[in-house]
Amino acid sequence: MKRFTLLMAGMLCASASFATDYYVSVGGAGEKDGSSVENALDFATMYANVNAYANGDVFHFAGGTYYVPANAPIVTNGYTFIGSTSGQPTVFSGDLNADGIANAGDASTLLAVQMNTVHGNTAKHFVLKNITFKNAFVNEASKAALKLDNSGWVDVENCIFEDNVSAYQTGSDYGGAACWSYRSTVNFSDCKFHGNSAAGRGGAIKLTSNAGTKGYTTLNRCQIYDNEAQVMGSAIFLHHGVKLDIINTTITGNKSGTEGEVAAVFAIGSDGTYARQITIINSTIAGNTGGAQILGRDKANVRLANSIIVGEEDNLAMRIAGTPTQLLSAGYNIIGVYKDGASAAPAWQSSDWVSSDNTLTSVFGQNGVAEGPASAPYGATAPQLTAALSEWGITSDLTADVNGTSRGEVSVPGAVVAEPMTGSFAITDAKYATYYHDFGYIMPTDVKGGVVTGANGESLNIDYKYAAGSVVPAKSALLLNGVSKTYEVALKLEEASEDAENLLKGTSEDATTTSDNANAKFYKLANDPQQGIGFYWADDNGNAFTNKAHCAYLALSGETASAKAFVLDGSATGIHGIAQVEASQSDIYNLQGMKVNASLENLSKGLYIVNGKKVIVK
């Protein structure tokens, strides 16, 4: 003990100038001075004297199970605790009675940190890496496996919180069996929370504060699953605080009771003291049972982008018990049933897919949530997401999914990169087709898409504005020109087309053609044996017809509708620029299909069909 006392005194003298790395094992080794793996500190001695080390020191814990004493010390300095990344994991366990489960007689807190710093203060920084926290049993107020108090900068990386139990349920100071963060700033990344339970107020995580300027939490690339609480958040309870950012994270399989305020993520509404803002980006909250996926009280404050939130059967996607202070969407979300007490519907973006048909089964099929959706279009591209979030102040990494897989330039919404929904169209030997889809899509290689901006006499003005690789807006009716084959296109959540000049229309299913003009004539793309590929009246009078699903049609009114056909030739502007072919004597037709009683030499300038070929007379 005398040697240890001298060692501690030496460490304190050195701490003013630099941080020191120490090595720790369950029982220690060699000289037990922490200078190397071979001379590791023993955990019991190190932990009992934890605040004697210098702020900034780093502790490397060997693999093994570290049984934390019933009265764990409160750490007041900024340290880095690093667990083993190979072989046996580093486990902080509360299982003092050694029966393998969390119950009476086990430790209630495995690590408590109280640095007494405010948000943004860099004087003390606490870091946890590669450590499992398990079998804490809480039966008193304000305790958890990881308890953070008044600490302005805590990072928790690649840690696991499992099988912790909070049985206490008196007053309001309970819940959050895995982590209770009180008036602190904590960033979780690549962490897992599972198998934790509480009577209520957060089966896994409870976030609270005593001041409106404290309480910042980020969950990035985390997995929160199979936790339980009867009420107020089977996964997370946001009680008081500034904000909670849920990014690239899955929350699934958590179980609530069936009565009261039941949901996987529960939040109190904002007020004059606490903003309580929840921001959900690139995340999946789905398949949680017993209540809504997200439940907020009156004045809940929620922002959403590029995420999937769906329930199943009676489990709503989102419910606000009153009127939200803010429900702000940056778009590209897949949302199931949403309900609130407001008189007006939320201001969803046109790139959001909000539908009662969006359920766990319809989106994920036979996949588990962790596998990613089986039926979802692409969400935001990287530039779109950056632009959409430009005013949100998000600094977290958005480039990787929950598994660390790169999202690339575009990926499906939610936490897991997966293959997108697809559509298809076929271009024949005539090199043209039309296409319409309620979703956007990415134009495939060897194809360009055009809108019809005008009709003049016998010609159409076609603007091929969508080149291969470009993103086509949702609900775009296009004329396609490309190499003959069948194409598969990746569908995408996208803002709806606002191209008011486009004279093409489309339907997502077999439906009768329509127009705002009662006197409109309707044309469909067809390949006439004599005139060639073009837009033709579907019947002799240009009346409405049944348009095929995912096809586009042309609707014209006024003088332009007197033409029965507009023949295409594959040039960028419709029929303009057709090369003159050799003249020969034969039956001659104009583009309206009428036979012309004149020789080719005596025709006026224009385009004619001779022997089934297009001929320009200049």
Regions found by a protein language model. Name each.
Residues 78-141, 165, 197:
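Right-handed parallel beta-helix/beta-spiral solenoid domain characteristic of secreted/periplasmic
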Residues 25-62, 403, 590-600:
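Acidic Gly/Asp/Thr-rich repetitive segments characteristic of extracellular carbohydrate-active
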Residues 455, 571-618:
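C-terminal outer-membrane/trafficking sorting elements
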Residues 55-80, 87-90, 322:
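N-terminal extracellular ligand-recognition/capping segment immediately after the signal peptide
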Residues 420-443, 467-531, 539-575, 617-618:
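A short, polar beta-strand/turn micro-motif
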